[in-house]
């Protein structure tokens, strides 16, 4: 059986209100098929944060994993950059 490589995404934390769960906004650019203009697209992912270490504004790296719940199938790998303290 062939082993598949897990998908990794990098994004910004937009919500940390849930216990052990963060919402990560992942942005990407893609080219419009007809006009050729680059368009910014985004998606929100729910990720498992075991130690509740993330705060809003952090830049994080998440990896796809087994389902933790109905909508949570990603897991926090590392905090790339902490948000500036206000």
UniProtKB/Swiss-Prot annotation:
**Family, per the entry?**
Belongs to the universal ribosomal protein uS17 family.
The record's Pfam families line, in alphabetical order, gives: Ribosomal_S17 (PF00366)
Write the record's keywords in alphabetical order, separated by commas. Answer: Ribonucleoprotein, Ribosomal protein, RNA-binding, rRNA-binding
How this chain assembles, per its entry, is:
Part of the 30S ribosomal subunit.
- GO CC aspect terms: cytosolic small ribosomal subunit
Q: What is this protein called?
A: Small ribosomal subunit protein uS17
Q: Which Gene3D superfamilies has this protein been placed in?
A: Nucleic acid-binding proteins
What one GO molecular function would you report for this record? rRNA binding
**Does the keyword Plastid feature in the UniProt annotation?**
no
According to its UniProt entry, what is the function of this protein? Answer: One of the primary rRNA binding proteins, it binds specifically to the 5'-end of 16S ribosomal RNA.
Keyword DNA damage found: no
Look up and give the organism this protein is from. Answer: Marinomonas sp. (strain MWYL1)
- What top-level branch of life does the organism fall under? Bacteria
BP GO annotations: translation
